[in-house]
């Protein structure tokens, strides 16, 4: 049985994968942001012409579910590589953004 992946291990694997192929020179913030946008668009494409009801059931079709998981993985991989290049801790960035949003958009009081 494989271990449950954790973020630092996945980040190391991505860095090692790119380094082994000498891709580091291509991993500029601009290129990674562009690749992230392309992969996000590929995820959107899966849902483009689906009704809301169809989109809610997308994971019930094994072939489509596989495509969705692959695109999610691509988006996450490029986002993590982008963060590594710019020395951004993605979990800290997310936590800080949630804090700002909680202040900016307070929950209604009952």
Language model: regions and residue ranges:
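Flexible "arm" and connector segments at domain edges
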Residues: 1-110
């Amino acid at each position: 049985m494989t271990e449950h992946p954790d973020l630092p291990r996945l980040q190391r694997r991505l860095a090692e994968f790119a380094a082994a192929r000498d891709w580091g020179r291509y991993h500029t913030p601009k290129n990674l942001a562009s690749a992230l946008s392309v992969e996000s668009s590929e995820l959107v494409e899966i849902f483009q012409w689906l009704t809301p009801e169809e989109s809610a059931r997308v994971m019930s079709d094994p072939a489509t579910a596989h495509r969705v998981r692959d695109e999610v993985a691509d988006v996450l991989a490029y986002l993590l590589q982008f963060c590594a290049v710019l020395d951004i801790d993605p979990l800290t960035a997310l936590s800080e953004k949630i804090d700002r949003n909680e202040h900016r958009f307070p929950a209604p009081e009952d």
